[in-house]
């Protein structure tokens, strides 16, 4: 199941401008007596799309030989989402479309000229982002992402979440659990 959840652009002004988060859900397949609630995931980044992450994770967990994998896969409603400004969430951040083209210098600058080239391109990228997306950029923080997660929890009518974060998603999970400790049932952090 896929859809959108409208959340405040600025949580200090909850009745002001709204943005739309792209959200997906793969419902639990176990009996209601074994249902464990919702499990939100984040692939990291920051800026990684999490909308389809669960379609990859669930089959991995269902493999034979994993002690608790099938139960984890089947007993939760798995919730994926594209963080604000990412992927299918709207508005989506768009800076310089050709920035990631094939015509760019090496990632590791080996000369002073390459350092200058990267600095010039980085400044141009940041300037273009600021001009085109300044209103959104000011609200693309980890705290905003954590508040978005709590909005997803509330919209689904759940008192708590279980969370599975990878890479930067581990930091996001820590921030969420700091802001909303009573809303965390279980927290799994993988890497970092």
Please place each PLM-identified region on the residue numbering.
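Gly/Pro-rich cap/lid or specificity-loop segments adjacent to the active site
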Residues: 1-192
């Amino acid at each position: 199941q896929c859809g959108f959840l409208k959340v405040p652009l600025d949580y200090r002004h909850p009745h002001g401008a709204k943005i739309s988060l792209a959200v997906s859900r793969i419902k639990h397949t176990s009996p209601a007596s074994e249902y464990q609630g919702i499990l939100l995931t984040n692939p990291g980044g920051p800026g990684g799309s999490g909308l389809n992450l669960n379609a990859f994770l669930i089959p991995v967990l269902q493999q034979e030989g994993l002690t608790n994998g099938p139960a984890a896969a089947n007993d939760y409603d798995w919730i994926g989402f594209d963080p604000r400004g990412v992927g299918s969430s709207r508005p989506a951040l768009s800076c310089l479309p050709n920035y990631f083209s094939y015509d760019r210098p090496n990632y590791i600058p080996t000369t002073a000229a390459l350092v200058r080239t990267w600095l010039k391109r980085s400044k141009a990228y940041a300037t273009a982002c600021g001009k085109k997306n300044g209103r959104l950029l000011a609200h693309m923080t980890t705290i905003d992402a954590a508040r978005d997660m709590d909005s997803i929890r509330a919209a689904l009518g759940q008192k708590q979440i279980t969370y599975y974060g990878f890479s930067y998603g581990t930091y996001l999970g820590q921030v969420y659990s700091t802001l909303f400790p009573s809303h965390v049932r279980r927290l799994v952090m993988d890497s970092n």
